[in-house]
């Protein structure tokens, strides 16, 4: 598979042939489920000119159906382009293909999609991760050069780690959220999934920057990262020792070898500890579900999306539309969020969660005052099997090493470093100071080149 960097040099005719080739391959590999049905039958001319980039089904592309992989949004056609799509088109790229996802980005396996599950290209019995599992599977399976996803608590980095590609979540506010179907507004961030670190920098440069359409967009100077990539920069890296030690034995051993390689290549390694991750999980799922319960209140059958046909009055329209339209996991999170925001529980749960979030952010900032980057696992294990019976709580633990990065609003990247005995991917996670994506990508490129060599 050619890289983004190579494809940007293609002629118009070569790009048209590339899109036809990708579309045919996607149809042939339909069983992977990386794309939802509406892409496979789409007239390729509507994608426009430019290097093709696959798009998660919660990012608005004018004229395309946008469903967030949910029954309740079937038939909704996006009336405008998200800011990231506008930026893509302005920088020589074109949206190409709707990627499958967990419904409303709530999940870690891409098994809750209305369209059916996505398979992991490395092993069809394993989950691709989530919620951007379709975006990761498309890149890892050679069905896309690169893709856009969204990351609320690890939804770009975790599937990238499970599928074996690079997953990069920029700092909160660095990439506009205008046109992203919201899950948790204070945590959501659009990110990129690519074949390598340089492509991640190129695609990030194309979509990043201040946007007046997004009130949470960071109005600070943005300097392109790809032209300034430097894999030879020697960095001070803080290894989160308790997280590495708590990971599965194969993941732990692979990360310890990676740390030794970083030392051997001249990077300074120091060891730090973070809080027990149970505090991250508690704070995250209170804040995220609280915000989700309000964000998803707009899906009521009145303005857009699918309305229940089994209605006699206004109350039945609301109740039946939402009961029939939302999947089980989405309902669970709406109920949890409504509960923690309710009278009598707001102070006991939501306010405490916000205090915990501030404490988590301060701990990261304390470590990064003295270090360039943080190193830790992306996931505690490699990709698990679909038939593994996991309770909702066990599933939430899949994001145990990624959610705190969103709570702190920092940038993070997942880089493949090894394979386990079954050939499944193991990745390392690097984390940077807020808005210091250049250092993050430099460190990731250094790590990637070490592994390849």
Curated annotation (Swiss-Prot):
It catalyses: L-glutamyl-tRNA(Gln) + L-glutamine + ATP + H2O = L-glutaminyl-tRNA(Gln) + L-glutamate + ADP + phosphate + H(+). The active site is at 56 (charge relay system), 131 (charge relay system), 155 (acyl-ester intermediate). It comes from the Bacteria. InterPro entries: Amidase, Amidase_CS, Amidase_dom, AS_sf, GatA. GO terms for molecular function: ATP binding; glutaminyl-tRNA synthase (glutamine-hydrolyzing) activity. It is an enzyme of class 6 (ligase). GO terms for biological process: translation. PANTHER family: GLUTAMYL-TRNA(GLN) AMIDOTRANSFERASE SUBUNIT A, TRANSAMIDASE. Allows the formation of correctly charged Gln-tRNA(Gln) through the transamidation of misacylated Glu-tRNA(Gln) in organisms which lack glutaminyl-tRNA synthetase. The reaction takes place in the presence of glutamine and ATP through an activated gamma-phospho-Glu-tRNA(Gln). Belongs to the amidase family. GatA subfamily. Heterotrimer of A, B and C subunits. NCBIfam families: gatA. This is Glutamyl-tRNA(Gln) amidotransferase subunit A.
């Amino acid at each position: 598979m050619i890289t983004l960097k190579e494809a940007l040099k293609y002629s118009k005719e070569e790009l048209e042939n590339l899109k036809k080739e990708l579309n045919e391959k996607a149809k042939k590999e339909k069983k992977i489920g990386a794309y939802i049905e509406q892409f496979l039958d789409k007239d390729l001319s509507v994608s426009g000119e430019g290097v093709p980039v696959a798009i998660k089904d919660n990012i608005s592309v004018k004229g395309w159906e946008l469903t967030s992989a949910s029954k309740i949004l079937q038939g909704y056609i996006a009336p405008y382009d998200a800011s990231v799509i506008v930026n893509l088109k302005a920088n020589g790229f074109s949206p190409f293909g709707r990627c499958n996802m967990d419904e409303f980005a709530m999940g870690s396996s891409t098994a809750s999609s209305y369209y059916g599950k996505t398979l992991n290209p490395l092993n069809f019995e394993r989950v691709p991760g989530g919620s951007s599992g379709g975006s990761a599977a498309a890149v890892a399976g050679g069905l896309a050069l690169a893709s856009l996803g969204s990351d609320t608590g690890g939804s770009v980095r975790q599937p990238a780690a499970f599928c074996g590609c690079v997953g990069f979540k920029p700092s909160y506010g660095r990439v506009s959220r205008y046109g992203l179907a919201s899950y948790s507004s204070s945590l959501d961030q659009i990110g990129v999934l690519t074949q390598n670190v340089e492509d991640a920098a190129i695609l990030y440069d194309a979509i990043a920057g201040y946007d007046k359409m997004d009130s949470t967009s960071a109005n600070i100077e943005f300097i392109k990262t790809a032209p300034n990539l430097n894999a030879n920069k020697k960095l001070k890296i803080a290894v989160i020792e308790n997280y590495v030690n708590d990971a599965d034995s194969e993941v732990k051993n692979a990360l310890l070898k990676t740390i030794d390689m970083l030392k051997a290549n001249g990077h300074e390694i120091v060891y730090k500890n973070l809080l027990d991750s149970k505090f991250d999980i508690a704070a995250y799922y209170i804040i995220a579900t609280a915000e989700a319960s309000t964000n998803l209140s707009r899906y009521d059958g009145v303005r857009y999306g699918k309305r229940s046909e089994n209605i006699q009055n206004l109350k039945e329209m609301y109740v039946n539309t939402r009961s029939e339209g939302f999947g089980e996991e989405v309902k669970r999170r709406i109920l949890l969020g409504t509960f923690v925001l309710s009278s009598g529980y707001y102070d006991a749960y939501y306010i405490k969660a916000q205090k915990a979030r501030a404490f988590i952010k301060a701990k990261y900032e304390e470590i990064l005052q003295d270090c360039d980057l943080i190193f830790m696992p992306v996931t505690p294990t490699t990709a698990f099997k679909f038939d593994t019976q996991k309770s909702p709580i066990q599933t939430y633990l899949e994001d145990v090493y990624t959610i705190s990065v969103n709570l702190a609003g920092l940038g993070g990247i997942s880089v493949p470093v090894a394979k386990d005995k079954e050939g499944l991917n193991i990745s390392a996670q690097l984390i940077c100071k807020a808005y210091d994506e250049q250092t993050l990508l430099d460190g990731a490129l250094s790590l990637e080149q070490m592994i390849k060599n």
